[in-house]
Amino acid sequence: MKRIIKTITVLLLLTACSKDHSDFLEGVTRQAAVTYLVTPNGLGDNGYNDAAAQGIFSFIIETFTPVRMLQPQDTTQAEQMYRQWLTDNADKDSAVLILGSSVYEQMARRVPVTLFGKGSRVLLFESSARIDGLSTVKVSRYGASYLCGAMSGGFDALVLSAVRNNPLLDESIMGFMAGYNAHHQEGKNAQVLYLADDESGWAMPDSAYRMMARRIRSSSTFREMVFPLLGGSDIGVLRAMNDEQNNLGLVIGMDVDQSALSPRVPFSMIIQTGQVLHDYLKDWLSGRDWPASRTLDMSQGAAQIMLHPSFYRHNTLMDYEYRDPDTFLNLYNRFIDEAVSKEQEYENN
Protein backbone atom coordinates (compact mmCIF):
# COMPACT_ATOMS: atom_id res chain seq x y z
CA MET A 1 0.00 0.00 0.00
CA LYS A 2 2.81 2.39 0.86
CA ARG A 3 4.35 1.84 -2.59
CA ILE A 4 0.99 2.49 -4.26
CA ILE A 5 0.55 5.74 -2.32
CA LYS A 6 4.03 6.82 -3.36
CA THR A 7 3.27 6.00 -6.99
CA ILE A 8 0.03 7.98 -6.96
CA THR A 9 1.73 10.94 -5.27
CA VAL A 10 4.50 11.00 -7.86
CA LEU A 11 2.02 10.70 -10.71
CA LEU A 12 0.09 13.68 -9.36
CA LEU A 13 3.29 15.67 -9.08
CA LEU A 14 4.30 14.79 -12.63
CA THR A 15 0.83 15.67 -13.91
CA ALA A 16 0.87 18.99 -12.13
CA CYS A 17 4.25 19.77 -13.63
CA SER A 18 3.55 18.85 -17.23
CA LYS A 19 2.04 22.21 -18.11
CA ASP A 20 3.71 25.28 -19.60
CA HIS A 21 6.62 26.82 -17.69
CA SER A 22 4.41 29.67 -16.45
CA ASP A 23 2.23 27.18 -14.59
CA PHE A 24 4.96 25.93 -12.27
CA LEU A 25 3.72 27.57 -9.12
CA GLU A 26 5.48 27.97 -5.82
CA GLY A 27 4.45 24.71 -4.12
CA VAL A 28 5.81 22.40 -6.79
CA THR A 29 8.81 24.55 -7.74
CA ARG A 30 10.12 24.73 -4.19
CA GLN A 31 9.74 21.00 -3.64
CA ALA A 32 11.43 19.81 -6.81
CA ALA A 33 14.96 18.50 -6.37
CA VAL A 34 15.27 16.95 -9.85
CA THR A 35 14.13 18.69 -13.01
CA TYR A 36 14.10 16.99 -16.40
CA LEU A 37 14.10 19.24 -19.47
CA VAL A 38 12.63 16.95 -22.10
CA THR A 39 13.51 17.14 -25.79
CA PRO A 40 10.92 19.32 -27.59
CA ASN A 41 7.83 17.25 -28.40
CA GLY A 42 9.71 14.24 -27.09
CA LEU A 43 7.48 12.36 -24.68
CA GLY A 44 5.24 9.70 -26.17
CA ASP A 45 7.78 8.57 -28.79
CA ASN A 46 7.73 4.91 -27.69
CA GLY A 47 11.49 5.14 -27.69
CA TYR A 48 14.37 7.23 -26.37
CA ASN A 49 12.45 9.94 -24.52
CA ASP A 50 9.97 7.58 -22.92
CA ALA A 51 12.82 5.31 -21.81
CA ALA A 52 14.58 8.28 -20.21
CA ALA A 53 11.41 9.28 -18.41
CA GLN A 54 10.94 5.72 -17.15
CA GLY A 55 14.45 5.73 -15.70
CA ILE A 56 13.79 8.96 -13.84
CA PHE A 57 10.40 7.66 -12.74
CA SER A 58 11.94 4.49 -11.31
CA PHE A 59 14.41 6.63 -9.36
CA ILE A 60 11.72 8.76 -7.77
CA ILE A 61 9.62 5.71 -6.94
CA GLU A 62 12.62 4.18 -5.16
CA THR A 63 13.72 7.32 -3.35
CA PHE A 64 10.59 9.48 -3.26
CA THR A 65 12.69 12.38 -4.51
CA PRO A 66 10.46 15.19 -5.83
CA VAL A 67 10.73 15.79 -9.56
CA ARG A 68 9.28 17.94 -12.28
CA MET A 69 9.38 17.61 -16.04
CA LEU A 70 9.59 20.55 -18.41
CA GLN A 71 8.45 19.82 -21.95
CA PRO A 72 9.11 22.80 -24.23
CA GLN A 73 7.50 23.23 -27.60
CA ASP A 74 10.79 24.19 -29.23
CA THR A 75 14.41 25.00 -28.42
CA THR A 76 13.63 28.69 -27.90
CA GLN A 77 11.22 27.89 -25.10
CA ALA A 78 13.69 25.31 -23.79
CA GLU A 79 16.35 27.99 -23.41
CA GLN A 80 13.91 30.22 -21.54
CA MET A 81 13.15 27.35 -19.15
CA TYR A 82 16.84 26.57 -18.74
CA ARG A 83 17.79 30.16 -17.94
CA GLN A 84 14.91 30.43 -15.47
CA TRP A 85 15.96 27.22 -13.72
CA LEU A 86 19.54 28.47 -13.37
CA THR A 87 18.27 31.72 -11.88
CA ASP A 88 15.83 30.03 -9.50
CA ASN A 89 18.38 27.48 -8.28
CA ALA A 90 21.60 29.52 -8.23
CA ASP A 91 21.87 29.38 -4.42
CA LYS A 92 19.91 26.21 -3.66
CA ASP A 93 21.39 22.99 -2.34
CA SER A 94 20.82 19.61 -4.01
CA ALA A 95 19.05 20.79 -7.15
CA VAL A 96 19.63 18.77 -10.33
CA LEU A 97 18.70 19.59 -13.91
CA ILE A 98 18.91 16.97 -16.66
CA LEU A 99 19.12 18.31 -20.21
CA GLY A 100 17.45 15.51 -22.12
CA SER A 101 19.53 15.16 -25.29
CA SER A 102 22.32 16.51 -27.48
CA VAL A 103 19.76 18.89 -29.00
CA TYR A 104 20.65 21.10 -26.04
CA GLU A 105 24.44 21.03 -26.49
CA GLN A 106 24.73 24.40 -28.22
CA MET A 107 22.45 25.97 -25.61
CA ALA A 108 24.59 24.48 -22.84
CA ARG A 109 27.73 25.94 -24.42
CA ARG A 110 26.09 29.33 -24.82
CA VAL A 111 24.48 29.73 -21.38
CA PRO A 112 26.97 29.67 -18.47
CA VAL A 113 26.14 27.53 -15.44
CA THR A 114 26.54 29.36 -12.13
CA LEU A 115 25.40 27.24 -9.20
CA PHE A 116 26.60 28.01 -5.67
CA GLY A 117 24.49 25.54 -3.71
CA LYS A 118 25.98 22.37 -2.25
CA GLY A 119 25.28 19.31 -4.40
CA SER A 120 23.53 21.18 -7.22
CA ARG A 121 24.39 19.95 -10.70
CA VAL A 122 23.48 20.01 -14.38
CA LEU A 123 23.75 16.90 -16.58
CA LEU A 124 23.65 17.04 -20.38
CA PHE A 125 22.62 13.65 -21.72
CA GLU A 126 23.78 12.16 -25.02
CA SER A 127 26.80 14.41 -25.41
CA SER A 128 30.50 13.77 -24.87
CA ALA A 129 31.43 17.46 -24.96
CA ARG A 130 33.38 19.03 -22.12
CA ILE A 131 31.49 22.11 -20.99
CA ASP A 132 32.37 24.22 -17.95
CA GLY A 133 29.94 23.96 -15.05
CA LEU A 134 28.14 20.77 -16.06
CA SER A 135 28.64 17.06 -16.70
CA THR A 136 27.95 15.14 -19.89
CA VAL A 137 27.24 11.47 -20.52
CA LYS A 138 26.67 9.65 -23.77
CA VAL A 139 25.85 6.11 -24.88
CA SER A 140 27.88 5.28 -27.97
CA ARG A 141 25.74 3.91 -30.79
CA TYR A 142 28.60 3.02 -33.09
CA GLY A 143 29.10 -0.61 -32.09
CA ALA A 144 25.41 -1.52 -31.87
CA SER A 145 24.78 0.21 -35.19
CA TYR A 146 27.72 -1.64 -36.74
CA LEU A 147 26.17 -4.91 -35.58
CA CYS A 148 22.79 -3.92 -37.05
CA GLY A 149 24.47 -3.15 -40.36
CA ALA A 150 26.35 -6.44 -40.44
CA MET A 151 23.17 -8.38 -39.59
CA SER A 152 21.36 -6.57 -42.43
CA GLY A 153 23.84 -7.59 -45.12
CA GLY A 154 21.41 -9.99 -46.80
CA PHE A 155 19.06 -7.10 -47.64
CA ASP A 156 19.05 -3.86 -49.48
CA ALA A 157 19.03 -1.41 -46.58
CA LEU A 158 17.46 1.97 -45.90
CA VAL A 159 18.80 4.25 -43.19
CA LEU A 160 16.12 6.84 -42.46
CA SER A 161 17.36 9.74 -40.31
CA ALA A 162 15.28 12.48 -38.69
CA VAL A 163 17.72 15.33 -39.44
CA ARG A 164 21.05 16.11 -41.03
CA ASN A 165 24.25 17.00 -39.21
CA ASN A 166 23.32 15.59 -35.82
CA PRO A 167 26.42 14.07 -34.15
CA LEU A 168 24.51 11.27 -32.44
CA LEU A 169 22.67 10.26 -35.62
CA ASP A 170 25.81 10.61 -37.72
CA GLU A 171 27.56 8.18 -35.37
CA SER A 172 24.78 5.63 -35.85
CA ILE A 173 24.81 6.11 -39.61
CA MET A 174 28.59 5.64 -39.78
CA GLY A 175 28.40 2.52 -37.63
CA PHE A 176 25.58 0.94 -39.61
CA MET A 177 27.17 1.68 -42.96
CA ALA A 178 30.55 0.34 -41.82
CA GLY A 179 29.01 -2.95 -40.69
CA TYR A 180 26.85 -3.20 -43.80
CA ASN A 181 29.65 -2.41 -46.24
CA ALA A 182 31.89 -4.99 -44.57
CA HIS A 183 29.38 -7.83 -44.83
CA HIS A 184 26.62 -7.18 -47.37
CA GLN A 185 25.93 -9.75 -50.04
CA GLU A 186 26.95 -9.06 -53.61
CA GLY A 187 24.39 -6.89 -55.40
CA LYS A 188 22.91 -5.48 -52.19
CA ASN A 189 23.07 -1.74 -51.45
CA ALA A 190 22.28 0.70 -48.65
CA GLN A 191 20.85 4.21 -48.93
CA VAL A 192 20.61 7.05 -46.41
CA LEU A 193 17.59 9.40 -46.54
CA TYR A 194 16.64 12.33 -44.30
CA LEU A 195 13.15 13.21 -43.16
CA ALA A 196 13.85 16.92 -42.56
CA ASP A 197 16.61 19.51 -42.56
CA ASP A 198 15.89 20.71 -39.02
CA GLU A 199 14.76 19.44 -35.62
CA SER A 200 11.15 19.11 -36.81
CA GLY A 201 12.18 15.72 -38.21
CA TRP A 202 11.97 14.23 -34.72
CA ALA A 203 8.20 14.71 -34.58
CA MET A 204 6.89 14.05 -38.11
CA PRO A 205 5.29 10.58 -37.94
CA ASP A 206 2.81 11.36 -40.72
CA SER A 207 5.61 12.39 -43.08
CA ALA A 208 7.57 9.27 -42.16
CA TYR A 209 4.47 7.17 -42.87
CA ARG A 210 3.97 8.73 -46.31
CA MET A 211 7.64 8.38 -47.24
CA MET A 212 7.72 4.74 -46.19
CA ALA A 213 4.37 3.87 -47.80
CA ARG A 214 5.44 5.40 -51.14
CA ARG A 215 8.69 3.47 -51.03
CA ILE A 216 6.92 0.17 -50.37
CA ARG A 217 4.32 0.78 -53.10
CA SER A 218 7.00 1.67 -55.65
CA SER A 219 8.31 -1.90 -55.53
CA SER A 220 6.42 -5.04 -56.43
CA THR A 221 8.40 -6.92 -53.77
CA PHE A 222 9.70 -4.53 -51.13
CA ARG A 223 12.45 -6.35 -49.21
CA GLU A 224 14.55 -3.66 -47.53
CA MET A 225 15.85 -3.67 -43.97
CA VAL A 226 14.97 -0.27 -42.49
CA PHE A 227 17.20 1.32 -39.84
CA PRO A 228 15.11 4.23 -38.45
CA LEU A 229 16.83 7.05 -36.56
CA LEU A 230 13.71 9.13 -36.12
CA GLY A 231 12.71 9.69 -32.51
CA GLY A 232 8.96 10.23 -32.36
CA SER A 233 8.66 9.95 -36.15
CA ASP A 234 9.58 6.27 -35.92
CA ILE A 235 5.96 5.30 -35.25
CA GLY A 236 5.10 6.38 -38.81
CA VAL A 237 7.54 3.86 -40.28
CA LEU A 238 6.18 1.05 -38.11
CA ARG A 239 2.61 1.92 -39.07
CA ALA A 240 3.46 1.88 -42.78
CA MET A 241 5.17 -1.49 -42.44
CA ASN A 242 2.01 -2.83 -40.82
CA ASP A 243 -0.45 -1.28 -43.27
CA GLU A 244 1.14 -1.88 -46.66
CA GLN A 245 0.47 -5.09 -48.58
CA ASN A 246 3.07 -7.09 -50.52
CA ASN A 247 5.67 -5.99 -48.01
CA LEU A 248 8.56 -8.34 -47.27
CA GLY A 249 10.67 -5.62 -45.68
CA LEU A 250 11.79 -5.53 -42.07
CA VAL A 251 12.46 -2.71 -39.63
CA ILE A 252 14.92 -2.64 -36.75
CA GLY A 253 13.39 -1.57 -33.45
CA MET A 254 15.05 1.54 -32.10
CA ASP A 255 16.13 2.51 -28.56
CA VAL A 256 13.65 0.15 -26.85
CA ASP A 257 12.00 -3.21 -27.53
CA GLN A 258 9.56 -2.37 -30.33
CA SER A 259 8.56 -5.91 -31.24
CA ALA A 260 5.03 -5.34 -29.93
CA LEU A 261 4.48 -2.50 -32.41
CA SER A 262 4.96 -4.54 -35.59
CA PRO A 263 5.44 -8.18 -36.65
CA ARG A 264 8.14 -6.89 -39.03
CA VAL A 265 10.68 -6.24 -36.22
CA PRO A 266 13.14 -9.15 -35.93
CA PHE A 267 15.41 -7.38 -33.43
CA SER A 268 15.82 -4.04 -31.68
CA MET A 269 18.80 -1.84 -30.91
CA ILE A 270 18.38 -1.19 -27.19
CA ILE A 271 19.89 1.92 -25.59
CA GLN A 272 19.81 1.81 -21.80
CA THR A 273 18.80 5.44 -21.53
CA GLY A 274 16.64 5.04 -18.45
CA GLN A 275 19.17 2.92 -16.57
CA VAL A 276 21.99 5.39 -17.19
CA LEU A 277 19.94 8.32 -15.89
CA HIS A 278 18.72 6.26 -12.94
CA ASP A 279 22.31 5.38 -11.99
CA TYR A 280 23.49 8.98 -12.30
CA LEU A 281 20.69 10.17 -10.03
CA LYS A 282 21.47 7.46 -7.48
CA ASP A 283 25.12 8.57 -7.49
CA TRP A 284 24.02 12.18 -6.94
CA LEU A 285 21.76 11.19 -4.06
CA SER A 286 24.65 9.25 -2.49
CA GLY A 287 26.96 12.24 -2.77
CA ARG A 288 29.22 10.72 -5.42
CA ASP A 289 30.74 13.08 -7.95
CA TRP A 290 29.92 12.86 -11.64
CA PRO A 291 32.81 12.81 -14.12
CA ALA A 292 33.07 15.86 -16.35
CA SER A 293 32.39 13.68 -19.40
CA ARG A 294 31.73 9.98 -19.86
CA THR A 295 30.96 7.66 -22.77
CA LEU A 296 29.32 4.26 -22.23
CA ASP A 297 29.16 1.54 -24.88
CA MET A 298 28.32 -2.06 -25.78
CA SER A 299 31.09 -3.52 -23.65
CA GLN A 300 29.40 -2.00 -20.57
CA GLY A 301 25.92 -3.11 -21.57
CA ALA A 302 24.73 0.43 -22.30
CA ALA A 303 23.82 -0.51 -25.89
CA GLN A 304 22.83 -3.96 -27.09
CA ILE A 305 20.83 -5.92 -29.64
CA MET A 306 17.68 -7.72 -28.48
CA LEU A 307 16.46 -10.58 -30.66
CA HIS A 308 12.69 -11.14 -30.80
CA PRO A 309 11.34 -14.72 -30.84
CA SER A 310 7.88 -13.20 -31.42
CA PHE A 311 9.03 -12.31 -34.94
CA TYR A 312 8.84 -15.98 -35.89
CA ARG A 313 5.62 -16.66 -33.99
CA HIS A 314 3.67 -13.78 -35.52
CA ASN A 315 5.15 -13.51 -38.99
CA THR A 316 2.54 -14.97 -41.35
CA LEU A 317 4.07 -13.79 -44.63
CA MET A 318 5.81 -16.28 -46.91
CA ASP A 319 9.29 -15.23 -45.84
CA TYR A 320 11.10 -18.45 -46.61
CA GLU A 321 14.51 -17.11 -45.64
CA TYR A 322 13.22 -16.57 -42.08
CA ARG A 323 11.88 -20.10 -41.66
CA ASP A 324 14.87 -21.00 -39.50
CA PRO A 325 14.20 -19.28 -36.13
CA ASP A 326 17.96 -19.03 -35.55
CA THR A 327 18.56 -16.86 -38.64
CA PHE A 328 19.25 -13.62 -36.79
CA LEU A 329 20.73 -15.36 -33.75
CA ASN A 330 23.38 -16.88 -36.00
CA LEU A 331 24.12 -13.48 -37.53
CA TYR A 332 24.35 -11.93 -34.08
CA ASN A 333 26.78 -14.58 -32.85
CA ARG A 334 28.85 -14.20 -35.99
CA PHE A 335 29.33 -10.44 -35.73
CA ILE A 336 29.00 -9.42 -32.05
CA ASP A 337 32.71 -9.64 -31.14
CA GLU A 338 33.67 -7.78 -34.29
CA ALA A 339 31.17 -5.01 -33.48
CA VAL A 340 32.57 -4.55 -29.96
CA SER A 341 36.10 -4.41 -31.36
CA LYS A 342 35.14 -1.89 -34.06
CA GLU A 343 33.49 0.32 -31.45
CA GLN A 344 36.67 0.36 -29.37
CA GLU A 345 38.66 1.34 -32.47
CA TYR A 346 36.15 4.10 -33.23
CA GLU A 347 36.29 5.52 -29.71
CA ASN A 348 40.09 5.45 -29.60
CA ASN A 349 40.50 7.36 -32.87
Where do the protein language model's features map onto the residues?
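Periplasmic-binding protein-like
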Residues: 92-102, 125, 159, 220-231, ...
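Hydrophobic alpha-helical segments within soluble ligand-binding/sensing domains
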Residues: 137-157, 270-286
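C-terminal motif of bacterial Sec signal peptides marking the signal peptidase cleavage site
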Residues: 14-16
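Hinge/cleft segment of the Venus flytrap/periplasmic-binding protein
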Residues: 279-349
